[in-house]
From Swiss-Prot:
Superkingdom of the source species: Bacteria
Protein family: Belongs to the TrhO family.
InterPro entries attached to this UniProt entry: Rhodanese-like_dom (IPR001763), Rhodanese-like_dom_sf (IPR036873), TrhO (IPR020936), TRHO_N (IPR040503)
Top EC class of this enzyme: oxidoreductase
GO MF annotation terms: oxidoreductase activity, acting on paired donors, with incorporation or reduction of molecular oxygen
Gene Ontology BP annotations: tRNA modification
Source organism per UniProt: Gluconobacter oxydans (strain 621H)
The protein's name in its UniProt record: tRNA uridine(34) hydroxylase
Domain Rhodanese residues, every copy: 127-225
Gene name in the database record: trhO
EC number: 1.14.-.-
Pfam families according to UniProt: Rhodanese, UPF0176_N
Length: 313
């Protein structure tokens, strides 16, 4: 991590626990977040809570105490990092059917998941030639970084993962292989469902990285790491590197995909409007709408900067 003081605390969290009435939890949680100046997004569903929030240490302490006091959440999984400024612009608490959408209603991680592997033990597992390593994230996330030797399912959404996994398993069985399966994702939540799904499909020897990529990058020294590239994150940092340092990628405000310097040098890149990944996916009307949104946001930022300048005189 950076030696420079970074005043903002960022917490990525999730927990599978039964909420009888998620809607009743939403109001008090949102009210407290707004009172404490917390920004980010939290998802509530009958199966639990998931999200990433950021704010001052004092505000985050109070909000995290509230979250841990929710039914069954005393031991929720969370990962801390720091930033020089808020990586979110607003606070949202949304009600969902699932806190991570897989589209397999019978899968319940509370009934069993794969075997957790600590970051410091991960290298040994994935270096074993009898281990199949699977990245459970979407294609645009995998594109900017993954573990050496990992299989990329090339999914556009997590809903596509079950079908891909069934096909891949059939391919392995046709070759007479029954390898160990190791899965990983950004913070661990997708692997709670993907390994639970694998077990429901009859796979016994399935493992997943405890704390996800973020915990690995925080824990394992870069010189010992088998991670290649950067890790996409769903906030204004866009990507992080070893030690959870902010990465080098920007994001396309039209499609939310990460962009490197080559992408931004493309003639198809227009700030806030299009990029090489989405230019052919958008209509002229959509691009016009994005351009207007970008203009309005620039005006709003200029007004905020001017207001701050007056206050500092």
């Amino acid at each position: 991590m950076s030696d420079t003081f970074e005043p903002i605390r960022i917490v990525a969290l999730y927990h599978f626990t039964p909420f009888e009435d998620p809607a009743a939890l939403r109001g008090p949680l949102l009210e407290l977040c707004e009172k404490e100046g917390i920004k980010g997004i939290l998802l509530l569903a009958r199966e639990g809570i998931n999200g990433t929030i950021a704010g001052t240490d004092e505000g985050m302490e109070r909000v995290m105490a509230h979250i841990r006091a929710l039914p069954g959440c005393a031991d929720l999984e969370s990962k801390d990092s720091r930033a020089p400024e808020l990586p979110f612009r607003r606070m949202k608490v949304r009600l969902k059917k699932e806190i991570v959408t897989m589209g397999e209603p019978d899968i319940d991680p509370r009934q069993g998941v794969g075997r957790y592997v600590a970051p410091e033990d991960w290298n040994a597992l994935i270096s074993d030639p009898d281990t199949i390593l699977i990245d459970t994230r979407n294609d645009y996330e995998v594109a900017i970084g993954t573990f050496k030797g990992a299989e990329d399912p090339k999914t556009k959404s997590f809903r596509e993962f079950p079908e891909w996994f069934r096909r891949r398993r059939q391919e392995l069985e046709a070759k007479g292989r029954l390898p160990k399966i190791a899965m990983f994702c950004t913070g661990g939540i997708r692997c709670e469902k993907s390994t639970s799904f694998a077990r429901a499909e009859g796979v016994d020897e399935v493992y997943h990285l405890k704390g996800g990529i973020l915990k690995y990058l925080e824990t394992v020294p870069e010189e010992e790491s088998l991670w290649e590239g950067e890790c996409f994150v769903f906030d204004q940092r866009v990507s992080v590197k070893h030690g959870l340092e902010i990465g080098t990628h920007d994001v396309c405000h039209a499609c939310r995909r990460p962009l490197n310097e080559k992408d931004k040098a493309s003639p198809l890149f227009v700030q806030g409007v299009s990029c090489p990944h989405c230019h052919n996916e958008r209509t002229e009307e959509q691009r016009h709408r994005y351009a207007e949104r970008e203009r309005q946001e620039a005006l709003a930022q200029a007004r905020r900067a001017g207001h701050l300048g007056v206050r500092q005189k």
